[in-house]
A protein has these predicted regions:
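N-terminal, polar/charged subdomain of small-to-medium soluble alpha/beta proteins
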Residues: 1-99
Length: 99
């Protein structure tokens, strides 16, 4: 699975990019070999009470695309929360596809 990480209007540290890559690599357990690319967009939102760090993850799978947008006070927290949501959506998509 090809992972593309993009930070908007700031430079993400190598340590954080490695953290993000590791998290996205874990998705391999939940998707089959037909899954496409994963796009991760990191951006800062100055006007948010829930946190100013925004992570948008798009996963291209056969039949549909899964997109999650999560806000938090840290990018790590936003990615962790997004991963939980993506796992649930993948399970739903698998159940739907197997019917």
């Amino acid at each position: 699975m090809n992972v593309q990480i993009q930070s908007v209007k700031f430079d993400a540290s190598k340590q954080f990019l490695d953290f993000s890559q590791k998290k996205m690599d874990r998705l391999d357990r939940f998707v089959d070999e037909r899954a496409g690319d994963v796009e991760v967009v990191l951006r800062l939102d100055p006007d948010s009470e829930k946190g100013n760090k925004v992570v948008v993850i798009s996963l291209h799978v056969p039949g549909s695309d899964i997109r999650v947008e999560e806000r938090a006070f840290t990018f790590e927290e936003a990615i962790d929360n997004s991963m939980d949501i993506i796992k649930r959506q993948l399970e739903k998509a698998k159940a739907k596809f197997e019917k």
